[in-house]
From Swiss-Prot:
Region (Disordered): 1-23
Major location (coarse): membrane
Lineage: Eukaryota, Metazoa, Chordata, Craniata, Vertebrata
Species: Sus scrofa (Pig)
Region described as G3 motif: 204-213
This protein's name: Guanine nucleotide-binding protein G(s) subunit alpha
């Protein structure tokens, strides 16, 4: 006599069969997802604020994700106008605060300064024609230009000159930003942003996180399964201070941050690709530094001023530094620029070699994040390094 308790209806058997097939599909998909995950190169962009990390991400979009469409460009118009407004406001506001202060070359422009300062904190500013008129006239004033040349003494966005030079273009009603405009546009990064792209059928995920001090606590969320860290440095920031405290030297902040990442116990096996960024601005500063020392009088006191800051004013060891034998200057590069950029490189390499244990390495590259061809070339050079790191990550090498 059969046991009725073990008998199954046709419907039950069909349901179990369907469940087994569903489980197989899920298992197969999980296996596929695991393979895709393991085959993906995850790159974590780190660095201090305003070093150029987000610009690197934009370049990856231009180079590998079909760039920016019309809608995306349209949404950036307001950000670009805000950059322009912030630039002229910051410069004219700084003129009276510098020591010695800077005066307008044309005193008749004072009413324009008054206008710019009066709209500083206006919410939802609508950029009327008179704003562009006043901004352009002030930007052409030699006193305003002199204040701009001393921008290391206050906090000014890097794109200030670029957008102030384009006032006549930006003010047009039918203005459409170029790729270069989008690369130059500065928007504070807050949080974590992921960009996915593919190069020669290899998947890359690039994570961009805010670089300001209060954003860095979020970095640890991104450390898991990272293939490589791209650490971005504003090489031109040797004579500037960070926004957070207006005291700490920006390049020294980057060196301290690099040291903390290099020695982080969670990252001891993760190699670092070092992007020594803003080489164009570094070259400008170094070459401007050849200006002679000037004297000025303020309140019957004699002051000595270098119109442009020398690296040794901030890093005294630069005075004893000689260009290394492994230096490979760019064609036509001034020897002073070569010496400066390799000094900065070697400051970072001193950190990596001092505490290196053979489990991770530092690969330096000189970059200009707003130069698409430079980033294309550098990233192509880095791909073999990243591939090797990826193979080592999964113990295939």
């Amino acid at each position: 006599m059969g046991c009725l308790g073990n008998s199954k209806t046709e419907d039950q058997r069909n349901e179990e069969k369907a469940q087994r097939e569903a489980n197989k599909k899920i298992e197969k998909q999980l296996q596929k997802d695991k393979q895709v995950y393991r085959a993906t190169h995850r790159l974590l962009l780190l660095g201090a604020g305003e070093s150029g990390k987000s610009t690197i991400v934009k370049q990856m979009r231009i180079l590998h994700v079909n760039g920016f469409n019309g809608d995306e460009k349209a949404t950036k118009v307001q950000d670009i106008k805000n950059n322009l407004k912030e630039a002229i406001e910051t410069i004219v506001a700084a003129m009276s605060n510098l020591v010695p202060p800077v005066e307008l070359a044309n005193p008749e422009n004072q009413f324009r300064v008054d206008y710019i300062l009066s709209v500083m904190n206006v919410p939802d500013f609508d950029f009327p024609p008179e704003f562009y008129e006043h901004a352009k006239a002030l930007w052409e004033d030699e006193g305003v230009r002199a204040c701009y040349e001393r921008s290391n003494e206050y906090q000014l966005i890097d794109c200030a000159q670029y957008f102030l030079d384009k006032i006549d273009v930006i003010k047009q009603d039918d203005y459409v930003p170029s790729d270069q405009d989008l690369l130059r546009c500065r928007v504070l990064t807050s949080g974590i942003f992921e960009t996915k792209f593919q190069v020669d059928k290899v998947n890359f995920h690039m994570f961009d996180v805010g670089g300001q001090r209060d954003e860095r606590r979020k970095w640890i969320q991104c450390f898991n399964d990272v293939t490589a860290i791209i650490f971005v440095v504003a090489s031109s920031s040797y004579n500037m201070v960070i926004r957070e405290d207006n005291q700490t030297n920006r390049l020294q902040e980057a060196l301290n941050l690099f040291k903390s990442i290099w020695n982080n116990r969670w990252l001891r096996t993760i190699s670092v690709i070092l992007f020594l960024n803003k080489q164009d601005l570094l070259a400008e500063k170094v070459l401007a530094g050849k200006s002679k020392i000037e004297l000025f009088v303020l309140d019957d006191r004699l002051f000595q001023e270098r119109p442009f800051s020398f690296i040794e004013d901030y890093f005294p060891e630069f005075a004893r530094y000689t260009t290394p034998e492994d230096a490979t200057p760019e064609p036509g590069e001034d020897p002073r620029v070569t010496r400066a950029k390799y000094f900065i490189r070697d400051e970072f390499l001193r950190i990596s070699t001092a505490s290196g244990d053979g489990r991770h390495y530092c690969y330096p590259h000189f970059t200009c994040a707003v130069d698409t061809e430079n980033i294309r070339r550098v990233f192509n050079d880095c791909r073999d390094i990243i591939q090797r790191m990826h193979l080592r990550q999964y113990e295939l090498l």
